[in-house]
């Protein structure tokens, strides 16, 4: 990422991420399509509303791996190979421990959280079953995300693509097998997801043990180096905290949707599944910009950073808005693929037509956050997103719904807070001194070493 044509480097790095996320989104949609078609709208509500709860519990740990990727990318760009080796093995060890913790926490807390979310009684038993099975296999999800961060930090987005394709195809086949033929219900959908996630984690691990560079995982070197873990956590914890608090805010939003009944849950759950396609350019360019920024700032190529970030921002915003326009036009047909109930379709289409045209500002926020994280300034995106997407969003919805009991009030909470965060990120991008952050970090580290 530090050499060659900027536009082609970013595009070629982002493209495999885009395609990989596309396949991942297909298998997320496949879960809901199979469940909605063969098990009915209550089961669809149980599965489709899963995103906010999963993000609440998984988002924190996976956010830490964003920090790991920044640290590895920084040392890789600076050619400090020994530190790259230490960071890779510390990340792997931490992934194993945190994945086991997440499994225990998820299985224990699922019933409590679902009840706090006002999950309707006709949906609750199936929701508990689905989530407990999902979190029983959380270790596979965490390990895959850790390995994915290592691949991306070394500038490799192709291999994660291959493994996602394999995982996605496996998930779709098992979904149909377990739900349609074995009659395992929502438990079959959860089991298919767990198996496919472990498969991608295992393949990624095997590949990283065979690569011939400083990112190679040597199993007997997998241990936590505490100074390195502190550095990873210092960079990644803000993103982890941000993910968890945003997840908590979305759980609160979901509980407001749940108050409108199982039709609203199913319709909005279906919308959230198709909304994932709008995140394809958002995620791919955000990750590409984080890696591009961390490597080039590590190599002190500041002009290259300016040109690359401008290209990434324009590309991510334009593609997200194009997808949003398609959603507005075809909303009823897209929601109707999951369940043909007129009430379910009405709720999902209403949400799509309220939010989709604002995907441009959502993409702008995420891409700018990716750039700033790549510079190691992870506290800034955390604070902006916590204030805008959590505090303001929850306060707006809680207060407004009390006076106007209309579900569209809940829907508007998203675009309003996306616009606020975009204003904040734009101001910091042009006014904040984020580009020279690594130099300050190196100066502090050298000063501390000299004192010792």
Please tell me what each predicted stretch does.
Residues 12-31, 133, 144, 167, ...:
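Transmembrane helical elements of multi-pass membrane transporters/channels
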Residues 26-45, 114-121, 177-184, 244-271, ...:
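Helix-terminus/linker motif at the lipid-water interface of multi-pass membrane proteins
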Residues 41-52, 131, 190, 262-277, ...:
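Small-residue hotspots at the loop-to-helix junctions and early N-terminal turns
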């Amino acid at each position: 990422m530090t050499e060659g044509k900027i536009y082609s480097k970013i595009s070629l790095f982002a493209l495999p991420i885009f395609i990989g996320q596309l396949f991942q989104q297909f298998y997320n949609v496949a879960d809901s399509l199979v469940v909605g078609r063969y098990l009915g709208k209550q089961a669809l509500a149980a599965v489709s509303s899963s995103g906010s709860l999963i993000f609440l519990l998984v988002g924190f740990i996976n956010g830490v791996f964003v920090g790991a990727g920044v640290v590895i990318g920084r040392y890789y760009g600076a050619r400090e190979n020994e530190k790259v080796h230490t960071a890779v093995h510390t990340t792997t060890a931490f992934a194993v421990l945190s994945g086991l913790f997440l499994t225990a926490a998820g299985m224990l807390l699922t019933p409590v959280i679902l009840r706090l979310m006002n999950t309707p009684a006709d949906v609750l038993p199936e929701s508990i079953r689905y989530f407990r099975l999902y979190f029983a296999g959380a270790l596979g999800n965490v390990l895959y995300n850790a390995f994915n961060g290592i691949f991306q930090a070394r500038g490799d987005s192709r291999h994660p693509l291959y493994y996602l394709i394999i995982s996605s195809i496996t998930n779709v086949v098992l979904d149909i097998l377990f739900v349609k033929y074995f009659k395992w219900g929502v438990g079959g959908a959860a089991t298919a997801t767990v198996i496919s996630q472990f498969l991608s984690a295992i393949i990624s691990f095997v590949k990283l043990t065979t690569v011939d560079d400083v990112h190679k995982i040597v199993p007997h070197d997998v241990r936590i180096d505490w100074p390195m873990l502190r550095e990873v956590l210092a960079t990644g914890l803000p993103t982890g905290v941000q993910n968890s608090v945003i997840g908590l805010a979305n759980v609160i939003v979901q509980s407001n949707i749940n108050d409108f009944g199982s039709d609203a849950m199913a319709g909005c759950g279906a919308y959230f599944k198709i909304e994932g396609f709008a995140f394809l350019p958002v995620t791919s360019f955000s990750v590409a910009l984080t890696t591009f920024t961390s490597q080039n700032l590590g190599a002190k190529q500041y002009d290259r950073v300016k040109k690359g970030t401008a290209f990434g921002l324009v590309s991510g915003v334009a593609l997200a808005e194009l997808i949003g326009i398609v959603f507005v036009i075809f909303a009823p047909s897209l929601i109707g693929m999951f369940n043909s109930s007129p009430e379910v379709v009405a709720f999902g289409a209403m949400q799509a037509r309220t939010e989709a045209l604002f995907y441009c500002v959502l993409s702008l926020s995420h891409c700018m956050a990716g750039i700033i994280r790549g510079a190691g300034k992870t506290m800034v995106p955390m604070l902006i997103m916590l204030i805008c997407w959590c505090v303001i969003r929850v306060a707006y919805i809680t207060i407004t719904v009390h006076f106007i009991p209309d579900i569209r009030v809940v829907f508007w909470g998203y675009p309003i807070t996306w616009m606020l965060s975009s204003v904040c990120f734009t101001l910091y991008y042009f006014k904040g001194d984020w580009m020279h952050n690594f130099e300050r970090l190196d100066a502090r580290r050298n000063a501390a070493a000299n004192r010792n």
